Amino acid sequence: MAPTSVSNARIEKAVLDAHEKQKNKHGGKNADYIPILAQVPSTLFGVSVATVDGQVFTAGDAGYEFALESISKIFTLALVIEQRGPRELRLKVGADPTGEAFNSVLALELHNDKPMSPLVNAGAISTTSLVDAVGPEDRWRQIVGAQSDFAGRQISISEEINASEQATNFHNRAIAWLLRGSGYIYCDPMEACDIYTRQCSTLVTTADLAVMGATLANGGTNPITGKRVIARKNVPHVLAEMTMEGVYTRSGDWAYTVGLPAKSGVGGGLVAVAPGQLAIAAFSPPLDKVGNSVRAQAAVAQIADTLQLGLFNVPGEEDE
């Protein structure tokens, strides 16, 4: 288990400082195309960091449970890569950024009907269909089981959020049928869409999400439970996808300015991973125009900068 290169005192201070500085940051609005998400208090704001040696630091509303939403994609992706290997995932779904909005179907039309990325909705629905299962309930059991293994505790679904999403997910149903027509879905299309919607409706806290990210940072072993969740060799593939497409159409800018693999969700959550060191998670419902939490982005970026976590940082002194 690799130790962090940053002291616990510095991490704790960075978390508290980021929460204090960003808690009054304005801008953005709750996702309103999923009715129940529009009702979440917009002032909620939590920040957490989990290290690879099992330390967890929190500030603000870090115990509030929110919908995992699109962040769930990385854990289903990890499950499928673990079961089928990175090559099969790449062949059957793709491993490239689309350059389009997360719910766009343009990539399907422009790239021979292939989803391209497992972190946009089309690719995520396709990835869900690749879970090696004997039926829908087995598929669901494995997906929520993977989320629970990453978090180190039993994760559960919000039936209220799921019902709200199932009542409005017409676009995703259409995507599932497009995938069926092109041959890039691997179970019944409506089963895949239903399970995908369910996986987005599970509840986590920022403390949970930080541990989930720290499991990736720790090479696939949960730093709290000690359980190996995915093979170390499969972690880089997940982190690569997070770098390319994790914060929607802002992914390139995020890599340029923050330099950490990350994944956001329209529930207001965001997780970023510093391999071998720690993960940062933040939550606040108001989103920017592309679907990323305004406060969460600011807090994660501040912590990454304070602790000099960016993957592209070059050690050494500045030249005169």
Curated annotation (Swiss-Prot):
Keyword 4Fe-4S listed: no
Q: Sorted alphabetically, which InterPro entries does this protein's record hold?
A: Beta-lactam/transpept-like, Glutaminase
Q: Name one Pfam family in it.
A: Glutaminase
Keywords annotated in UniProt: Hydrolase
Gene Ontology BP annotations: glutamate biosynthetic process; glutamine catabolic process
E.C. numbers: 3.5.1.2
- For the protein in the UniProt heading, the enzyme class is hydrolase
Q: What's the protein name?
A: Glutaminase
* Gene that specifies this protein: glsA
